[in-house]
Amino acid sequence: ANGNNALVVVDGVPLSSPMTNPGMAYGAGDAAELSVDYGNGFSDLNPEDIESIQVLKGASATALYGSRAANGVIMVTTKSGAGAKKGLGVSYSAHVSMDNVMRWPDYQYEFGQGQAKNIGAEGTAYAGQHYYSYGAGPDGTPSTSGTSSAFGPRFEGQMFYQYSPENQGRADAATPWVAYKDNRKDLFQTGYTLTNSVALTGKSDRGNLRASITHTKNEWILPNTGFQRVSAMVSAAQQISRALRVNFKTSYTYRKINNTPALGYNSNSIAYFLIFQNPNVNLDWLRPMWRTGQENVKQLQPYSSFIGNPYVILYESENPSEKHSNVSSISANLRINSK
């Protein structure tokens, strides 16, 4: 079933179009239940080989392809050698595109981790004041770090006992209370897509040929994500006789994805991390990924066990895929009353 997706038809051949692993957007019990968009048949198409795209809706779509086309049809016609000049021709193209996060939510960096009720008790250093303490303070002040809420003290450079990346616990000395305003943005990078394509065409009075090969390399805006795709295509047409013409097209695509980030509301989702990342957390503190002495066993989650370490998600909880696909079609046109 296609769900609510349109049916994709390439040179008359319907392609499978549902997402590979729809999973659960909310309430997933573990990483395996999260949604992962590995793409569909349309993502296997090489844009360099597309001649035209036509969209069919309603009765015209279902009349041709039945119930599968209830959500419409995207009809793709690939290139051939029909429009080429006589003789042989070779063309080469290359292009690169860059990607960045276009817009960010207006995150608040005025207050840090904690709750409004965290007021220092009489006899402590923070008596009657909002305070922060990563773990119990040296004077017995209770910990305020066991929450993902950011209703704690205002950032005014106060001296609090905070997390120390050196000992992966409470620092031995108080440090200034400051916000790290790029502690989400710095997880992302500039992505790019590089494409190189070569095509060979040939045409005579009785037929035409087009063959192409394209390599695409993508590095996405999150580290350790992206894909490589190699596409090859051959299109040929030959006038066998005055009455008979044969057309043949075949395409092969190899697509390898090194990591597709999971989607949804779960601790193994980058989106989940972005929601609950606190403004007083330096992103660099999470880069070691593992607790010292427990490498590859226990991930470093200094602020909450409910929030996955983003670097573990990206480098260890990978969702790779490798796919080979082929679409071929052959047709013959016979003129009955040919003279």
Language-model region placement:
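Outer-membrane beta-barrel transmembrane strands
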Residues: Q189-D205, T214-T216, P310-K339
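Short acidic/polar hinge/loop motifs at secondary-structure boundaries
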Residues: V13-K57
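Transmembrane beta-barrel domains of outer membrane proteins
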Residues: T77-K79, A199-K203, S212, M233-A237, ...
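Surface-exposed loop/interface segments of Gram-negative outer-membrane beta-barrel transport/assembly proteins
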Residues: N21, G83-A179, T190, W220-T225, ...
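Short beta-strands and strand-coil junctions in structured, solvent-facing domains, enriched
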Residues: A1-N2, L15-S17, A59-L64, G81-A84, ...
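N-terminal periplasmic accessory domains that precede
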Residues: V9-D11, A63, A69-A94, V198
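Membrane-spanning beta-strands of outer-membrane beta-barrel proteins
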Residues: L34-G39, A69, T193, F227-R229, ...
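Repeated loop/turn-to-beta-strand initiation elements of outer-membrane beta-barrel proteins
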Residues: R206-L209, A243-V246, K339
